[in-house]
Amino acid sequence: MSFEEAKAKLEAAGQTHVLQFWDELSAEERGTFLEEISQLQPDELVEHCREAAASASRHSSADGRLDARMQPVPPEFIGSVRKSDRETLQKWENEGLLQISQDRVAVLLLAGGQGTRLGVSYPKGMYNVGLPSGKTLYQIQAERIQKVQELANVRHGCRCTVPWYIMTSEFTLGPTEKFFKDNKYFGLCPSNVVMFEQRMIPAVGFDGKIILEKKNKIAMAPDGNGGLYRSLVDNKILADMERRNVEFLHVYCVDNILVKMADPVFIGFCVTNGADCGAKVVEKAYPAEPVGVVCRVDGVYQVIEYSEIQPETAELRGSGGELVFSAGNICNHFFTRSFLRDVAEKFESKLKQHVAIKKVPFVDGEGNLVKPTKPNGIKMEKFVFDVFQFSKKFVAFEVLREEEFSPLKNADGAPLDTPTTARRSLLAQHYRWILAAGGSFLDEQNKPFTPKHSTAQIEDPPAVCEISPLVSYFGEGLEMLLNQKNLKSPFILDENEAKNLVHTV
């Protein structure tokens, strides 16, 4: 792109100030700047800047009018681990493993965010929460994929593949690619790990003007996890899924240490019910818990953010004392490939733009970098769950929080969602698995611990124990290894230890 072409494009969008420092730039700086500007589409840019300014003013005057239009998800559209018998859960698991065995299931990771709130500059998936093994979130997830493939292979006598699609951003793609290469893709075939980058869009001032973060660089931000749908087309991911005959997709966020990759029970539940779109939910812990609620508004399924619900609505209870709006969203979804194609081709442009008012560093009229002390800019983003409204058959699946949801969002010192709470959640789960398998722990005097099945994030489990996902996906196969075994803390059950235990049975 030439300077004249860039100028014409920006004039058409009413953003000529972007080139105000052109005469001060080196040839190299001009080249990279023109490359960035070439990615912008004038029509989209005009609409984006106009909508950002308008949305910011609406955002400041938002009210709770949604409350009167909200309805909970009808019981017939909610499956539940807690309320289902073992036979039903087994039926769903069998169906899920069948679909996996036929190479019809893939997983897609939303990994565009950095670990800023954790106090690190690298992608969250590279974070080590302090497990005895030292494993990162990426490694845990990769090993769960390997194990669920193995479970399907053994059940159906085949050799299947669960492709792993990873949506990154400008900030996370490079480090993530290097991390996977350096770690030999954690045992997965590199051709089955497909990374792609979501779109970046300009940050805009309250006056509707694009913000410059440098003299030759526009302040850009990822377009939210709802940018997935456009990225699936832009990066030919839907075409890749079709080539692989993938029909069902499990989509999740990177920061949940308990996530079950391609969960056969969830996949089986959705497929059995003929769903084109599904969401895992957990029962809200308390009315004001800061999680979105899956519900219906004017008869259409969607997620309402906790900040949009008035306290009196959040506190509504049913005849049994349960919260009426209890289905907490955990960013853990099921989609059919055909539904994703419909969204990408027909509905993506209709997705709601959510406003985030942020402090955006910028260069002033003199070219000096300014780090604002109060919010000065607007970042627009779309959310992955805003497609529920387009579903022809939506279902929700309630899972147990202690088994499936422990997000990593904040640095230690915060009350919730920290490396410590994530670590405790996983270790407590593994402690419960060992007790359920008939194992027990000895203290330093070789006396048995008193079993304690109920463990919480506020304390460490009575014994430190970690089970590799390569040994057990959701607690299966442990009884033959651990029944009537006396173990000492810390105990790490990896593949080598499992082989040793088999030889002592």
From Swiss-Prot:
Q: Where does substrate bind?
A: N225, K409
As recorded in UniProt, its EC number(s) are: 2.7.7.-
GO terms assigned for molecular function: UDP-N-acetylglucosamine diphosphorylase activity
Disulfide bond residue pairs: none
InterPro entries with a match to the protein in the record: Nucleotide-diphossugar_trans (IPR029044), UDP-sugar_pyrophosphorylase (IPR039741), UDPGP_fam (IPR002618)
Per the UniProt entry, what are the Gene Ontology biological process annotations, in alphabetical order? UDP-N-acetylglucosamine biosynthetic process
Query: Which residues, by range, are in coiled-coil regions?
Result: none
Superkingdom of the organism of origin: Eukaryota
- Motif: Substrate binding; annotated at 110-113, 305-306
Q: Which residues bind UTP?
A: L110, A111, G112, G113, K124, Q198, G224, D255, K379
The answer to whether UniProt assigns keyword Transferase to this entry is: yes
List keywords of the entry alphabetically.
Nucleotidyltransferase, Transferase
The family database entries (CDD domains) matched by this protein are listed as: UDPGlcNAc_PPase
Does the record carry Transferase as a key word? Answer: yes
Q: What PANTHER family is this protein classified in?
A: UDP- GLUCOSE PYROPHOSPHORYLASE (PTHR11952), UDP-N-ACETYLHEXOSAMINE PYROPHOSPHORYLASE-LIKE PROTEIN 1 (PTHR11952:SF6)
Family label: Belongs to the UDPGP type 1 family.
From the Swiss-Prot or TrEMBL record, give the protein name.
UDP-N-acetylhexosamine pyrophosphorylase-like protein 1
What organism does the record attribute this protein to?
A: Danio rerio
Give the encoding gene's name: uap1l1
